[in-house]
Each structure stands twice: as C-alpha cells, then as structure tokens.
Swiss-Prot record:
Keyword Oxidoreductase part of the UniProt annotation: yes
Gene3D superfamilies according to UniProt: Luciferase-like domain (3.20.20.30)
Protein name: Alkanesulfonate monooxygenase
Species per Swiss-Prot/TrEMBL record: Escherichia coli O127:H6 (strain E2348/69 / EPEC)
Positions of transmembrane segments: none
Length: 381
C-alpha cells in the first residue's frame, strides 16, 4: 500500500526549540511559502494548516499558497458552531475550484472552553458534537448539489444551495479526529478519513477497530490517518540527541503552565496525550521510538517518531499494517525538517507521489441572474 505523506505549515510559530523564544524565527508569508514549495517539490501529498486563535487564518493561508505550488493539497479546518454550513460549503467549493481540486477539509469541533467562548460558542462537549453532526450533514448535501431544507436542534437552513460546484466529485474529502464515543460515531457516519494522534500502536489499533466497526454498522468503509512529529537523522544516536535538544530550554514552570491549560479542555484526545507523559520529563519514550516530549508544552499532536531513516520507516509501517494510509508529519524547524524527512525517510517507504493535476475545464457561464441562478442556453425551436 502506497502511503500519503503530509507536512505541516506552522502558522502558530516555529523554531529550533520548544517553549522558548531562543532559536525562534519570524513566520511570515515568505517563510510559509518556502515550506509549502519544499513540500510540493519533495513529494508530500499535502499540508495540514492548523486552526485556532494561536494561528493565522487557515483559509487565507491556503488560498495564498495556491499560485506558488503545483500539486500540493491543503488540509483546511471546517469549524462547526463558528461558521454556518452554507457559508462553509461555498468557501470549500471556491477553494477547490481555485486550486484545481487540491482542497481537503478537516472537521474541528474545538475543545477549549475559553477559546470557544471568545468565538461566541457556549455549547458543551456533547452539544458541540450534535451541532457538528448537523453541520456536516448540511455541508455534504450542499456540495453534492442538493437544495437543502434542514431543521435540526442547532442548524436551521431553508432553500440553501450552491451555484458553483467543487472540482472534486462527489465532494472534497472530509477528515476528522476525535477520541470520545460521540466523536467516533460522527466519524463513522459522515467523514471519509479518521485521524488519530500518535499514540502507541496497540492503542491506535483499538481506536481503528472501534471506528471501523461503527462505520460498518452504517454500511460505510472509512480510511485512517495519523498525526505525528518526526525527528529523523542519519543515526539513531543523532536523532535522540536532537530530541533532547528540542526540549533543552524547557523549565518546570513552563511545563506546568502548559499542562494546566490542557487540563481545562474537554478533549478526550488531549487527555489521552497528556496521560502519555503526565507532565514529567522522565520516561518519555512511551513505545519503541515513540517520544512524548513534544506534548509537554504543545497541544494536540504531542508525540514524535525518533530514529534513523530505516528505524522510523519500520515504525511507520507498523502503523500502516493497522490500516493507516495517511501520515500527517511535522518537525522543528519545519523547513529544514521537511527536507530531512524527504531525504532520509521517504527512500525507505512506499510513498504515493502525487501527480500535477491537469486543469479542469469549467463550463462557460454568464453572470448569475438576480443572485439566484446561473443562466443556461435556451433551446432553439
């Protein structure tokens, strides 16, 4: 099975070390463009663009990278409860059309009550997933070309429709990650690829089995992906030394503050990440070559595969044997590490190198009439 390898655009900051300004660098458009172009040339399938108040806006960043890349896809967040499904569907179709079919979407429900409150969202965990399920149902139907009337608990639309369809049919693929039962049920029923953070293989296997069974109950098959950091070097010793350097500027106070911030979230996945290290520096290798040091201060994905190219490739193939076909990777700093992964790791894997998409001709059309419909040719009698 060929593997889809993704990289990451660090719109929330980048540098050589975690938890310090030492060794950091400006993350401006030029720098993000360098990373995107490197990923494009090295054969990555796409890039994940993060979302939230600590990041630049993912949609604007993705749109700005379209003209400077050729085959790279953009995995961009959909935010139920923050955006209406109709507006999100229009945005999704536009991004797909302007990028010639290079748009992918990642459903993000949110987990930090403080940040959500700042965005005007006051739903609890279960309510957010109810709203997300309704949002996704309407979003998908719109991209399928339906005119949608929907009267749910959280979402209400009447006569919603898209005038401009996406390039990818039936619609651009929808990704999603969540560890709670309600999250897995949503994934099983509505999404195309279920993402997990980088837990030890036995825990990932358990997750995959649960989601696969739930999807089968809905008569569906679902793909799987995993989100990991990577520290790959020419030797295992060099890789482990690089891992230690990454957290060499962390002090106990910074770790404690970060863990306190994570504790206020209601994300089951974040709780599982935190439990891998319990905020302590010792015993960070939680599974062969799987290191939890990143999660001491970074929210979300908090583990890294560490080793030389053949060693990291062996660990990746262990995950692939569980049914994972997509790997969303990152490393610090992201420009240099994109090259290291491409040069030291890719040769040891069966990497699916994306082709440059051929331009998709769009049907000629006149201006929309009354902002309501696209004019068509009148049949001659």
């Amino acid at each position: 099975m060929s593997l889809n390898m993704f990289w990451f655009l660090p719109t929330h900051g980048d540098g050589h070390y975690l938890g310090t300004e030492e060794g950091s660098r400006p993350v401006d458009h030029g720098y993000l463009q360098q990373i995107a172009q490197a990923a494009d040339r090295l054969g990555y399938t796409g890039v994940l663009i993060p979302t939230g108040r600590s990041c630049e806006d993912a949609w604007l960043v993705a749109a700005s990278m379209i003209p400077v890349t050729q085959r790279l896809k953009f995995l961009v967040a959909l935010r139920p409860s923050v955006t209406s499904p109709t507006v999100a569907a229009r945005q999704a179709a536009t991004l797909d059309r302007l990028s010639n079919g290079r748009a992918l979407f990642n459903l993000v429900t949110g987990s930090d009550p403080q940040e959500l409150a700042g965005d005007g969202v006051f739903l609890d965990h279960s309510e957010r997933y109810e709203a997300s399920a309704e949002f996704t149902q309407v979003w998908r139907r719109l991209l399928l070309g339906e005119t949608v009337n929907f009267n749910g608990k959280h979402i209400h639309v009447r006569g919603a429709k898209l005038l401009f369809p996406p390039i990818q049919q039936p619609y651009p693929p929808l990704y999603f990650g969540g560890s709670s039962d309600v999250a897995q049920e949503l994934a099983a029923e509505q999404v195309d690829l279920y993402l997990t953070w980088g837990e030890p293989p036995e825990l990932v296997k358990e997750k995959i089995e649960h989601v696969r069974a739930k999807a089968a109950a809905h008569g569906r098959k679902i793909r799987f992906g995993i989100r990991l950091h990577v520290i790959v070097r020419e030797t295992n010793d060099e890789a482990w030394q690089a891992a230690e350097r990454l957290i060499s500027h962390l002090d106990d106070e910074t770790i404690a503050k970060a863990q306190a911030a994570f504790a206020r979230t209601d994300s089951v996945g974040q709780q599982r990440m935190a439990a891998l290290h319990n905020g302590k520096r010792d015993n960070l290798e939680i599974s062969p070559n799987l290191w939890a040091g990143v999660g001491l201060v970074r929210g979300g994905a908090g583990t890294a595969l560490v080793g030389d190219g053949p060693t990291v490739a062996a660990r990746i193939n262990e995950y692939a044997a569980l049914g994972i076909d997509s790997f969303v990777l990152s490393g610090y700093p992201h420009l240099e590490e994109a090259y290291r992964v491409g040069e030291l790791l890719f040769p040891h894997l069966d990497v699916a190198i994306p082709e440059i998409p051929q331009p998709q001709p769009l049907n000629p059309q006149g201006e929309a009439v009354a902002n309501d419909f696209i004019p068509r040719k009148v049949a001659q009698s």
